[in-house]
């Protein structure tokens, strides 16, 4: 993402938040800590929301803190939605970069779908409840 290397695990799609923050701190001369993010009440509420909506079992969380010393697996690994929220917390201008990246990726995939996009939407809407599409 931009000038930052983002690491994602294949087994669960979690992202390494510690690695991203380390890169940010080195580039900007900052001293932010992942635990600062976890200390926010809004973070706790968001974690609860992810757990509720993604049907996490008790004792299973949308993040994992690893102390592994080998293989680059150390750090805090986060569910993709939690990672996006974390990345936006780092800095307001970085928040813009994160949102722009997500938006651009959405448009890119829509453009890749091209002429098939309306057909795809129709097919998806035929298998989902009608009230899902009402605002």
What role is predicted for each listed range?
Residues 1-134:
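An anion-engaging/catalytic patch
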């Amino acid at each position: 993402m931009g000038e930052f290397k983002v690491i994602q695990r294949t087994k669960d799609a979690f992202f390494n938040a510690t690695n991203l923050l380390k890169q940010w701190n080195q580039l900007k001369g900052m001293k932010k800590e992942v635990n600062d993010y976890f200390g926010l009440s809004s973070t706790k509420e968001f974690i609860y929301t992810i757990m509720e909506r993604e049907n996490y079992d008790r004792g299973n969380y949308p993040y994992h803190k690893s102390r592994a010393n080998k293989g680059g697996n150390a750090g805090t690994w986060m569910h993709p939605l939690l990672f996006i929220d974390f990345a936006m917390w780092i800095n307001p201008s970085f928040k813009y970069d994160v949102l722009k990246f997500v938006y651009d990726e959405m448009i890119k995939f829509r453009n890749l779908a091209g002429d098939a996009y309306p057909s795809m939407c129709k097919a998806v809407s035929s298998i989902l409840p009608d009230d899902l599409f009402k605002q």
